[in-house]
Curated annotation (Swiss-Prot):
The entry's keywords: Methylation, Ribonucleoprotein, Ribosomal protein, RNA-binding, rRNA-binding
PROSITE patterns: RIBOSOMAL_L3
Name of the protein in its database record: Large ribosomal subunit protein uL3
GO aspect biological process, one term: translation
């Protein structure tokens, strides 16, 4: 199954097993994902589900987007996401239908995608885990500097991709093979063991693990 869900990161807590073992979990609220469009190979060149979730003020919805949602007969959401489908998937799903957390009832491991927390401009030690130079013994100005940037006259430049200071975080990333501890269909919650990318209230995409 490649169909996933779009949710909102609520925060972290812990749950206890029957043996009294504490398990840290991330709580993800998954409102019903409304299907805005079903893409097919004949019409679009590939198979996919386009979904939305949440709400958005009518004044914040562009006219083309409003028409797109109205065509599917659904309420405008806070964004649009796509899930690619295999050949034998999605045949029973139509535009305007809803997908809930119950699709994960038989799933044990998931992959979670989100936007990592932005850290701003950071040096090499924090950004790339470089080792600090000595605090003394001849080091006076470069305790936290990156060190050498490369060779001298040959090649006479800094190679592309060199790990240096710069903007850290605020990038799309995925954490794989996280254990799905609990599916709460009544409250539309997923409890996932451990941490997931992103800040509280950030959008996250939950899919069945590809390496399970």
């Amino acid at each position: 199954m490649t169909i996933g869900l779009v949710g909102r990161k609520v925060g972290m807590t812990r749950v206890f097993t029957e043996d009294g073992v504490s398990t840290p979990v991330t709580v993800i609220e998954v409102e019903a994902n409304r299907v805005a469009q079903v893409k097919t190979v004949d019409n679009d060149g590939y198979s996919a589900l386009q979904v939305t979730t949440g709400k958005r003020k009518a004044s914040r919805v562009t006219k083309p987007a409003a028409g797109h949602f109205a065509k599917a007969g659904i309420e405008a959401g806070r964004g649009l996401w796509e899930f690619r489908l295999n050949e034998n998937e999605g045949s029973d799903i139509e535009a305007g239908s809803e997908i809930t957390v119950e699709v994960f009832n038989d799933t044990k491991l998931v992959d979670v995608t989100g936007t990592s927390k932005g850290k701003g401009f950071q040096g090499g030690i924090k950004r790339w885990n470089f080792t600090m130079q000595h605090a003394t013994h001849g080091v006076s100005l470069s305790h936290r500097s990156n060190g050498s940037l490369g060779q001298c006259q040959t090649p006479g430049r800094v190679f592309k991709g060199k790990k240096m200071s710069g903007h850290m975080g605020a990038v799309r990333c995925t954490t794989q093979n996280l254990e799905l501890v609990r599916v709460d269909a009544e409250r539309n919650l997923l409890l996932i063991k451990g941490a997931v990318p992103g800040a509280i209230n950030g959008n996250v995409i939950i899919k069945p693990a590809v390496k399970a």
